[in-house]
């Protein structure tokens, strides 16, 4: 299949690995202190483990896993608020499948469904809007989450709801923005991040120019990369070349999909419906400044929290779990004491084990046979 198979060709992968090994000899980094490349996308993390790319790297280069999975950073209190709304009579609560099993303090949405709440999996926000139109006597809530990748679809759905004057449709907002998160990571002392592989999907919307501050303010190289083995390895080569040349630039490996200016139509829809306002809590990371997303005044009537007024929930993460350290690249999934025993895909303790794009779920699926210390 064009654009898939040609980016997985084993002989080309091994040629690129050999080239990477050769160029890595020119790096000042060693096995004891490798060049630490953070991939900031759950899709990248999954691909790295699936294809074993981290095991093909030179010993002085290391992939570390960042907070690029929106399901993985869902705070427990937000799940509890969703359960409270979903459990009310007359409510149909809709969300994506990955969010169903994320544990809150009072269980998960899947467990709420088992207790009798009308919780349904949808594949797009438009599915939830259609449910609202088909059930005018019910209140339908769509739990929208994700980075800028999914925000345009939510924005277009809310535009449709407004144009059709649907008055029983509500939106519980858990959209978050990527760039403040990267700034927050880099502001942490001794963050240990030398370079970034930026997510292709988010970049398709926001473009590459939005990352300029990472190069100019923090002097870190960044490459926007695709999701196939050759994409990721080529992205690593580009970062190595920047490091050798002592450059800090934003480069685009994924030009077949990502224009430097992004998607202006998607950006316009987002600006119409959403505003960046205030701080947002991230599971495992705490509160991140300026990462919150709210509805603009024209769409306030669809705000589920304003309509249902769930009790404010602030739940602290269990200190036994090391989710925050995994999300910031400070430890590997298997180094968490709960990994595979208390926390596994069948009985997830943390959100990183729930989503297929979570670092812990990917490690469990592809590396659980390894007994690393």
Spans of model-derived segments:
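Phosphate/pyrophosphate-binding betaalpha-module
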Residues: 143, 147-210
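Metallocofactor- and cofactor-centric catalytic cores in central/energy metabolism, strongly enriched
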Residues: 1-137, 151, 155, 159-164, ...
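A conserved active-site cap/scaffold subdomain adjacent to cofactor or substrate pockets
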Residues: 172, 190-259
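Structural motif
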Residues: 92, 139-141, 195
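Hydrophobic alpha-helical scaffolding
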Residues: 6, 72, 143, 147, ...
């Amino acid at each position: 299949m064009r654009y898939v198979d040609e980016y997985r060709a084993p002989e080309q992968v091994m040629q690129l690995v050999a080239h990477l090994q050769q160029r890595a000899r020119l790096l000042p980094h060693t096995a004891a202190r490798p060049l630490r490349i953070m991939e900031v996308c759950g899709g990248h993390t999954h691909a790295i483990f699936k294809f074993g790319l981290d095991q093909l790297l030179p010993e002085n280069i290391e992939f570390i896993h960042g907070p690029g999975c929106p399901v993985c950073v869902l705070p427990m209190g937000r799940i509890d608020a969703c359960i409270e709304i979903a459990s009310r009579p007359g409510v149909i609560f809709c969300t994506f499948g990955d969010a169903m099993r994320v544990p809150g303090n009072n269980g998960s949405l899947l467990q709420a469904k088992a207790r009798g709440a009308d919780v349904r999996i949808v594949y797009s926000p438009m599915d939830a809007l259609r449910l609202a139109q088909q059930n005018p006597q019910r209140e339908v809530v769509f739990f929208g989450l994700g980075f800028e990748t999914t925000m345009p679809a939510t924005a277009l759905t809310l535009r449709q709801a407004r144009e059709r004057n649907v008055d029983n449709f509500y939106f519980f907002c858990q959209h978050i923005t990527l760039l403040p998160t990267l700034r927050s990571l880099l502001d942490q002392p001794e963050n240990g991040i030398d370079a970034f592989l930026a997510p292709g999907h988010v970049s398709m919307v926001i473009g590459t120019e939005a990352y300029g501050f990472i190069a100019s303010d923090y002097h870190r190289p960044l490459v926007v990369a695709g999701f196939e083995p050759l994409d990721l390895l080529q992205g690593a080569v580009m970062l190595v070349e920047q490091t050798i040349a002592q450059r800090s630039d934003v480069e685009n490996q994924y030009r077949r999909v990502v224009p430097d200016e992004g998607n202006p139509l998607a950006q316009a829809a987002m600006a119409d419906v959403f505003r960046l306002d205030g701080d947002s809590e991230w599971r495992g990371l705490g509160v991140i400044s300026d990462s919150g997303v709210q509805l603009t005044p024209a769409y306030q009537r669809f705000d589920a929290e304003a309509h249902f007024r769930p009790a404010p929930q602030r739940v602290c993460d269990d200190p036994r779990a090391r989710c925050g350290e995994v999300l910031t690249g400070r430890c590997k999934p298997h180094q968490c004491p709960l990994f595979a025993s208390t926390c596994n895909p069948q009985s997830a303790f943390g959100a990183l084990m729930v989503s297929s794009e979570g670092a812990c779920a990917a490690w469990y699926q592809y590396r659980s046979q390894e007994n690393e210390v």
